[in-house]
Amino acid sequence: METMKSKANCAQNPNCNIMIFHPTKEEFNDFDKYIAYMESQGAHRAGLAKIIPPKEWKARETYDNISEILIATPLQQVASGRAGVFTQYHKKKKAMTVGEYRHLANSKKYQTPPHQNFEDLERKYWKNRIYNSPIYGADISGSLFDENTKQWNLGHLGTIQDLLEKECGVVIEGVNTPYLYFGMWKTTFAWHTEDMDLYSINYLHLGEPKTWYVVPPEHGQRLERLARELFPGSSRGCGAFLRHKVALISPTVLKENGIPFNRITQEAGEFMVTFPYGYHAGFNHGFNCAEAINFATPRWIDYGKMASQCSCGEARVTFSMDAFVRILQPERYDLWKRGQDRAVVDHMEPRVPASQELSTQKEVQLPRRAALGLRQLPSHWARHSPWPMAARSGTRCHTLVCSSLPRRSAVSGTATQPRAAAVHSSKKPSSTPSSTPGPSAQIIHPSNGRRGRGRPPQKLRAQELTLQTPAKRPLLAGTTCTASGPEPEPLPEDGALMDKPVPLSPGLQHPVKASGCSWAPVP
């Protein structure tokens, strides 16, 4: 029976489509349980999923009082390259407030160009990426969630990642405390997986949309092989150079080299969750504010034990897996300590059986969390550190207990020094823009008692991805900025763009279509 259940689980979402979930108010109460439910439906196979909160929920009463938050080190993202293959690095700019940044983002020089739809804007992005470098207000430590927001508050998700601080006394900003990102048109994040191949969650608080691209985890190694061929100098210098977050590869190049991927656009008021070893990239459509943090589940532990590490020191963020294995995999702890744990990660296997109802998981999840001493943690790190404001003197920074692990930079992949804080509000509610599903997404409405107990989730069939001959309209991939420091290795001369495709990568020209995964079309 268990074998049959396992096979049924693997059959969920065989095309690796990005799935969209609409939890009810009740289903939204337990974050850990809902992530398990999403995986039981196969959401993890895409590497990325969208969650649209219930209409009764809100992250924050008002955003009217955030203009004086200080962006201490805005970063100008400079890209070089051609034919859909770029590198990106940062130039530090002078500090500015969020209000000043918003004004800059909406100025004639940096504003979003006129466009007919998202696809038209994507074409403009890739055609003009190397010109007029945008400025990103990234890696700002803090949260915009109100303290009284109990569900899906990124300041205290209460997942097993809390063991990192509880058992090891380690706090890494951006990993187990939230980061804020203030974006403008063309600000980007390059192809990467999360540090230690953790999960991540991103909430778009306000502003213009964010487009995401993702390669299914079961095809991540194919992207790595292609990146090594396209960036041979970086590959020779570091075995895990994609962790530097400098490599920009367009969807056209991915398609020409047979790399399966998907695309979706996130709008204000929506969550995106990335799954372990899901390579992702993307760009912002205009001024916006997002918040992100990593988290973990029991399914991640084997990923963490096998995660690649930056070997050159440019972007090394790591921590011991000891507490996670000792507490959550006690039967394998001794083998793991001796280096004899031969577990193999199964990218297709979900965390819980697909037949297990969402409503019956509470008695399984809660006792386990209680046994570990996990709870909905208050944002103690936030309360001790007020926001850095432009006119405020004597701003305090919360002391991080990281031993030799400095703060990681989510944008550049480098380790940097700690920064500060969090803010809360209490005014009128803000409106949440309506959302529109992406072209390759499944809509998931989990069943509940009111709509018919035990009824399987409603699914709107996704547009199937095929290995068609490229059409005229390009499908795009996103990018991020690299850290300040040495400039990227030389690429083909600047100026040529996606209309001149790069040669196909040897050995990847005629890939065998893997079981159950989709192939991204150029619409």
From Swiss-Prot:
Keywords: ADP-ribosylation, Chromatin regulator, Dioxygenase, Iron, Metal-binding, Nucleus, Oxidoreductase, Transcription, Transcription regulation, Ubl conjugation, Zinc
Protein name: Lysine-specific demethylase 4D
Compositional bias per record (Low complexity), positions renumbered to this chain: 428-440
Chain intervals with Basic residues compositional bias: 448-458
Residue numbers binding Zn(2+): C238, H244, C310, C312
Region Disordered, annotated ranges: 407-523
A GO term from the CC aspect: pericentric heterochromatin
Limits of the JmjC domain: 146-312
Keyword Nucleus: yes
Primary role: Histone demethylase that specifically demethylates 'Lys-9' of histone H3, thereby playing a central role in histone code. Does not demethylate histone H3 'Lys-4', H3 'Lys-27', H3 'Lys-36' nor H4 'Lys-20'. Demethylates both di- and trimethylated H3 'Lys-9' residue, while it has no activity on monomethylated residues. Demethylation of Lys residue generates formaldehyde and succinate.
UniProt-annotated location(s): Nucleus
Reaction(s) catalysed by this chain's protein: N(6),N(6),N(6)-trimethyl-L-lysyl(9)-[histone H3] + 2 2-oxoglutarate + 2 O2 = N(6)-methyl-L-lysyl(9)-[histone H3] + 2 formaldehyde + 2 succinate + 2 CO2
PTM comment text: Ubiquitinated via 'Lys-63'-linked ubiquitin chains. Deubiquitinated by USP14 with the help of TRIM14 leading to stabilization.
